Amino acid sequence: KWRINGMKKVGIFMADGCEEIEGLTVVDIVRRAKLEMTTISITDKKEVTSSHNVTFLTDTLASEVDFEGFDAIVLPGGMPGTLNLGASDIVNKIIKKFAAEGKIVAAICAAPSVLGAAGLLEGRHATCHPGFEEKLTGAITSEDAVVVDGNIITSRGMGTAIDFGLAIVECLTEFDEEVVGHVKKGIVYRNFEEA
């Protein structure tokens, strides 16, 4: 029905040990908003096994992606998925590049710690899974479900994944009420009729 100025492209890095709900909820919400979403494995295989032993296939491998056309990159949490993301050269390269270019960098649960380690949270407001606050180097921490500070979006965990996905859509569509309302109605989001 609607057309967003220039199709927005979102990538989500998937690592073995990721929290599947945090990752796949964002994929679902972004696709419901009719934005282009690509699931990206950080290993040499498309198959990813989550922290709760759910195995799924990604769209592509990080080594095969041209990230130039992307508008946002997302990091789901989970353990040891977050550690795997943090240890990935390509993840660190892309999040730093996107942050410097003003593109959206979004992380949930433990994954904001990867942003902290990369120096991307200095002086920024951010949130994370309880117990990871010390790893948000330089951040002004919050207990809010989702925190948007410029082009950095952070969230607390599986229970906030829908709000996290909606925040990503809101930022990418410049808070287009028609798009966001369509998604909220489609997922029977709380108070969607008021939105």
Regions found by a protein language model. Name each.
Residues 27:
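Histidine-anchored nucleotide/phosphate-binding helix
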Residues 9-12, 18, 33-41, 59-195:
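Active-site-adjacent pocket-lining segments in enzyme domains
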Residues 40-59:
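N-terminal beta-loop-helix "entrance" segment that forms/cooperates
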Residues 18-23, 47:
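Short N-terminal binding/cap micro-motifs at the start of the first secondary-structure element
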Residues 1-6:
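Short, Lys/Arg-enriched N-terminal segments with co-localized hydrophobic residues
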